[in-house]
Amino acid sequence: MNESARKAMPMKVLPAVAAAALLLAGCTVGPAYVRPTVDAPAAFKEAGDWKPASPQDPATSDTWWTAFGDPVLNALQARVEVSNQNLRAAEAQYRQARALADGARASWFPTFNATAGATRSATAASTASAGSAPPANSFSLGATASWELDVWGRIARNVEAADLRVEASDADLAAARLSAHATLAQNYFQLRAADRQKFFLDAAVAAYERSLSLTQNRYAAGVAGKADVVQAESALRSARASALDASLSRSQYEHAIAVLVGEAPAGFAIASIDAPLPVASVPVTLPSTLLERRPDIAAAERRVAAANAAIGAAEAARFPVLGLSASAGFRRSDLADLIT
């Protein structure tokens, strides 16, 4: 075979290798994911026509708490987005999932490595009369390239699983955000309820104090007995204890809100408001509609799909890894000759 024929052979082989790689890439192993279904009757005796799922309820808004019309609650909810540590952790986990997905996707592309080395050696003389050989320098540069052919779909399945984990992490972030806002709203309304309770208990304490004073005056005048005074004192002590319990409960809710907004409880305070609790208009809905607002359900379903994709990656690991690789290198005794 002449020299020109040998040079032409690689150019003819490369298209064939590329075509074979594309054909073999379709041999992805592992089961295809099928979303789980739940057996349901054809009709329910309590309901008539079916309603298609359409989660367009205003209550699903990202700022659902504004329906209560409370400016203090709105300001606290805005601080949750900035300072809540649970949200920061969920966001970091989402960024981690994105980075891992990018790393899995990088396996589609070839990898390149470069090496460099330098040695200096000297050979001792074999006889006493012979002089020592001068030291010899050696410089080398090398490069390697490799590309794994995804014959069995291992890389494809890993990328699919990583992308599904990103979707699950995104749903986890939405669940963490919903949980933080809902917990803050619950604690805030409990605090406002404690304010109202404390207001009525303080009024009751003032009334019992007046009643005790009147009873003591009646006792001094000989109109009431000692038992009436003792009963009035007992009622006053009970009212004061209830008022103290309401104050302690309010402090606990205030401290919980401080933690949710990322502040130290010692330096955080919410002014008491003697006003009725706001009531939002809650739309009439179905339990199935409420499930559409559950991001944790979406996260669980995405993890099932990711586990299904991981089955294919595990099955592909049983087969040999096929790839293409090439390497080249140079060695010179003079560094200037190597880099020019």
Task: Spell out what each predicted region is.
Residues 49-79:
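Regulatory alphaC helix of protein kinase catalytic domains
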Residues 2-27:
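Gram-negative bacterial Sec-dependent N-terminal signal peptides
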Residues 3, 155, 171-286:
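Periplasmic alpha-helical coiled-coil/stalk elements that build and connect Gram-negative outer-membrane
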Residues 86, 158, 197, 228, ...:
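DHp/HisKA histidine-phosphotransfer helix
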Residues 27-48, 78-150, 182, 250-268, ...:
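A small-residue-enriched
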Residues 66, 78-79, 190, 217, ...:
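Surface-exposed charged/polar residues within alpha-helices that form helix-capping/stabilizing sites
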Residues 151-160:
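Short, polar/flexible loop-turn hinges at active-site or ligand-entry regions and domain interfaces
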